[in-house]
Amino acid sequence: MIPKLSPNADPCTACASTPAFPPQPMEEEGEFLYQLRLEYSREVLYARFHAALRVHTFVVVPTRYGNDIARCVGRIRTPVQTDIASVVRVASDQDLCTWHIHREKERAAEMIFRDRIEHYQLEMKCICCHYPLEEARVVFLYSAPARVDFRELVRDLGATFGTRVELRQINEREEARIVGGIDCCGRALCCCSVFSRLRPVSVKMVKEKNLLFRSTQMMGRCGRLRCCLTFEE
């Protein structure tokens, strides 16, 4: 909007005093769509909320394991082709206190889990442990080259923790997203810094870009084709 100038006003001074981009109000009425990220797995969720949220605000949102803590990544202004949840509430001090207590418990649980894997000589690797905010259970994410019979392990862990134990196998790309790291380009891995969701990558993408297919150069830290091959799709 062009500011109105008084007859005796200096045009340069008047324009300089008018901000080009006026500050946006912190609170708006209506319902807005936000992109959220789960802290333990870096998975992305989409949820609606009735008020404006700052980036990095912690909220409570429904997940596969019940209500849990997620961080606001930003507001979404275009439609998304995925399931959309509803934010339960902005995380309270009590929610954040419980979340921090759970994170301390997770570190100890991971050590016990790794010790039990070694005891039972199972070919699997512990990636992370998670205590949901409002659920009486503990979830272990692991990777393995093949299917693992861990029934005895689950019984042992259940007796140790005195609660419901759930083991969930994840693939190599999901593992890389959780663990993170720096790739050969010197930047953080795309799967945990650029993409909100893991996109499929195929050999066809390499051929379409007229790139030489050298396995050592085209493979990422996860052992699969690099996510950056999808940038020009």
Swiss-Prot record:
Listed transmembrane segments: none
Superkingdom of source: Bacteria
A Pfam family annotated for this UniProt entry: PSP1
Domain PSP1 C-terminal, chain residue ranges per copy: 85-170
GO cellular component: cytoplasm
Alphabetical list of InterPro entries matching this protein: PSP1-like, PSP1_C
Function noted in UniProt: Supposed to have signal peptidase II-like activity.
NCBIfam families in the record: RicT_YaaT_fam
Protein's name in the database: Protein tpl
Gene name tied to this protein: tpl
